[in-house]
Amino acid sequence: HDVKFAKSMCGALFSLKCKEVNTNTLFSCLSLRKYVASQFKPSVAKAIYDYFHADRVVDLCAGWGDRLAGFYASKYGKSYFGIDANKNLQEGYSAQIKEYSKLFPEKTAQVVYGATEDENIVLPECDFIFTSPPYFGIEKYSKDDKQSYLRYRKIDKWLEGFLFPIIKKSIKTLK
């Protein structure tokens, strides 16, 4: 792992066109977050939900369930609807929802498996859209054919086929 990490850091230094290596350039390389998947801090999600008084939340790329955890921790929030293209996460979502529902029975949550841009995915009405789409070509969580990096192999195709359509689709559900 040390060699792989060193190679990724060298790649980041090269991408940033760093002329020298120091604390600041190393921090910049680490903060790119493009060499490892990162967690969206549930505490940050909670703070955002609270600040905006989010009641009906739609999460277009539910990820590891971090924003779901923030939803349950928020003093606001009545319903959460998430979608994710990684089939391997469904069991984890179900377990999270089951446990959180014991503590917060007044809140409802559902996470479905699928590609948000597909027409068969119907988004519920919401007052808050909150998501963290995968970095193009970097975050590769499974070989599932619904993964955006496999469906859209070029950045322009990914933007046109994935990112822009899910944004447009979700805006229509805002009430």
Question: Where do the language-model regions lie?
Answer:
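N-terminal accessory regions of S-adenosyl-L-methionine
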Residues: 1-38
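Long, hydrophobic/aromatic-enriched structural stretches that serve as scaffold segments
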Residues: 19-20, 33-46, 58, 62
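Short, contiguous strand/loop micro-motifs
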Residues: 32, 54-56, 154
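Soluble or luminal CAZymes and related metallo-dependent hydrolases
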Residues: 37-40, 92, 158-165
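Conserved S-adenosyl-L-methionine
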Residues: 45-119, 128, 169-170
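Mobile active-site "lid"/loop adjacent to the S-adenosyl-L-methionine
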Residues: 116, 126-166
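Helix-to-beta-strand junctions that scaffold the AdoMet/dcAdoMet cofactor pocket
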Residues: 173-175
